[in-house]
């Protein structure tokens, strides 16, 4: 009986052992949690696309084509010298015909094509129309020529190469007062575009501070820009020797042609960057005699870098570059300087925009439009020059001429 009981106990013990081993063998062990994969750095090198929008056709095509051509020359020079930080640059420039809605569409095409940095728009309305989208997309804007004060507002990653309108208007009054030019003046401006209105308002405010007397103010609109007889007669009646014309070159050409022979031969016509291109627009260059424009660029500046650009432009495009071409050229070199300062080596850098914005506030660019730095609100700090047209040629103005 005892032997039987021992045998039963042994059998039960074996059965329990087998059951335990079976249960352990059937248990599914959870695999060890995998460490999250570290984010791989973006591959170095590649092509970094710079996009731009501007009028390549239409009334203001001279501005858009000049910016595009100047920018392309800079891109070609940089790539020929080995690129920047192992990357090559490409330029994709879309035609807006000067229309803000078309500019928005063109900006969208550039984003779809892989744009990483933007030249914004050539005109102020174009740039203002895409600034919000660029902020949302995380794309830095450096517009060569959008000068309206509000063109880059609302986006901390928006900068410009040109002077803002209010700065140009103020500087114009300062230049007239400080360089022995007539201080009894007339003003002729376009009252339905921001560029002209902004320049006039700033000029008027500074003129009062600088002892400049505005004898008459004459205006026109887009719908009345073909006949300036009334305005010219009023200017003549005022007896002034200087007319401030903060307008674009196309309207200026019409005005100067109609004013020829009606205003005194020695009358000075003083404008800003919008007059750049007047010699290519006006039918008779003699009608542009004594036209002055405040600009940061002068094609006859003997500076070696300026003359190198003028030569390259003449070889590749033909003719003499205007300020807009120079602005486009400087914008690309500013991008290059910021890329180098930020240490960006790949177009796919996930922090490209943030790095570029920080770098823009630290770089100094020895541009052909003057040595430039930028403020936190995107405004350039650089000197201005004045040009005067004599015998169909624009040249640097020297006080006392």
Predicted regions and their residues:
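Periplasmic-binding protein-like
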Residues: 110-122, 142-144, 185-189, 239-249, ...
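Extracellular/periplasmic bilobed ligand-binding domains
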Residues: 200-294
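Short, low-complexity disordered leader/linker segments with a strong preference
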Residues: 1-49, 80, 112, 136, ...
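Segments of small-molecule ligand-sensing domains
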Residues: 315-325, 336-394
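Extracellular/periplasmic periplasmic-binding protein-like sensory domains
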Residues: 256-329, 390, 394-396, 400
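Beta-alpha junction/loop-to-helix N-cap segments that form part of ligand/metal-binding clefts
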Residues: 62-69, 81-152, 161, 220-228, ...
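An alpha-beta-alpha
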Residues: 158-219, 242, 335
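Extracytoplasmic "Venus flytrap"
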Residues: 44, 48-72, 94-100, 122-123, ...
């Amino acid at each position: 009986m005892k032997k039987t009981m021992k045998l039963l106990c042994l059998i039960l013990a074996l059965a329990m052992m087998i059951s335990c081993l079976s249960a352990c063998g059937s248990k599914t062990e959870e695999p060890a949690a995998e460490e999250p994969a570290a984010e791989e750095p973006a591959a170095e090198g590649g092509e970094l696309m710079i996009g731009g929008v501007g009028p390549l056709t239409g009334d203001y095509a001279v501005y858009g084509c000049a910016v595009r051509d100047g920018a392309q020359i800079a891109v070609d020079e940089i790539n020929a010298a080995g690129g920047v930080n192992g990357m090559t640059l490409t330029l994709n420039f879309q035609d807006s015909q000067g229309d803000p809605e078309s500019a928005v569409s063109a900006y969208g095409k550039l984003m779809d094509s892989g744009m990483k940095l933007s030249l914004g728009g050539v005109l102020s309305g174009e740039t203002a129309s895409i600034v919000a989208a660029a902020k949302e997309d995380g794309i830095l804007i450096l517009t060569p020529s959008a000068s309206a004060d509000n063109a880059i507002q609302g986006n901390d990653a928006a900068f410009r190469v040109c002077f803002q309108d209010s700065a140009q208007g103020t500087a114009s009054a300062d230049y007239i007062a400080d360089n022995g030019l007539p201080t009894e003046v007339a003003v002729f401006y376009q009252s339905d575009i921001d560029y002209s209105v902004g320049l006039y308002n700033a000029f008027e405010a500074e003129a009062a501070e600088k002892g400049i007397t505005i004898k008459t103010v004459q205006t026109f609109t887009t719908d009345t820009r073909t006949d300036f007889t009334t305005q010219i007669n009023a200017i003549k009646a005022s007896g002034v020797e200087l007319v401030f014309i903060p307008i674009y070159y196309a309207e200026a050409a019409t005005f100067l042609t109609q004013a020829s022979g009606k205003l005194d031969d020695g009358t000075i016509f003083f404008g800003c960057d919008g007059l750049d291109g007047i010699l290519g627009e006006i039918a008779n260059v003699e009608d542009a005699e004594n036209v002055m424009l405040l600009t940061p660029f002068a094609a006859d500046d003997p500076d070696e870098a300026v003359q190198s650009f003028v030569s390259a432009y003449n070889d590749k495009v033909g003719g003499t570059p205007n300020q807009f071409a120079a602005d486009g050229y400087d914008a690309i070199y500013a991008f290059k300087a910021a890329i180098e300062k930020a240490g960006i080596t790949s177009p796919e850098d996930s922090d490209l925009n943030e790095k570029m914005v920080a770098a823009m506030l630290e770089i100094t660019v020895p541009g052909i439009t003057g040595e430039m730095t930028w403020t936190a609100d995107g405004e350039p700090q650089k000197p201005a020059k004045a040009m005067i047209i004599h015998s169909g040629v624009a040249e640097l103005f020297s006080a006392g001429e």
